[in-house]
Amino acid sequence: AGSEEYFMNLLADAMEPLLLANGIQFVRNDPQGTVGNSIRQSNADSYDFHLALHSNASGSGSEGQNRGIIVFYYPGSVSGQRAAELFASALREIYPLPDRVTTRSAENLTELRRTKAPAVLLELGYHDNAADAMWVQEHIGLIAQTLVQALTEYFGLPYVCPGPSQTGLAVTDSGGPVNLRSYPSAQGQVIVQIPNGSTVTVFGRYRGWYVVLYGDALGYANSAFIQL
């Protein structure tokens, strides 16, 4: 047994290596903080997306009687609605009652109303329903993978299965820098140039590209210029 907070943090823990392997940088909220703290943290920088992980609770008198997943977005947010529909579509593939995975707009949820970035709030089943609670507990890894796959689709990235992280060196024959790009393509935007001989961390591979962390910059580098 455990609290909603406990299992949602386990889920976030499981998502971390998948996000890194897919070139998606992230910041997590303080588990001890309030919703207000999470909103302020989200608005303190120029983030591309805000994802809130929750489980639902039935109203008084109907505890344990409800099941289902609700994906909330703020009304009028085109990006938020698009993300919500991607999450819902992916979750229908793994939730035992796919017809009970729905999207819904909501004006009254502060994590949607007050965040600057497009936002989605996930209610992953009802924690007062034994079957829903057990489904979450027994499928943390699968749920994490499903959510990250939806995020890669949202960001237009290929999904990469994570391997063990490895230390590598950025090396070019010319001695010039290695471009770290936002997408695994020579047309991808250059995020930063990695000086020749620099140490990097490699989290995954997609075709001829490695997912690389250099300093605090995460992106894709041509595997020809990374020695493991």
Where are these regions (language model features)?
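A short macromolecule-binding patch
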Residues: G215-I226
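Extracellular/periplasmic catalytic domains that process cell-envelope and extracellular macromolecules
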Residues: N43-D45, E63-Q65, L112-K116, I194, ...
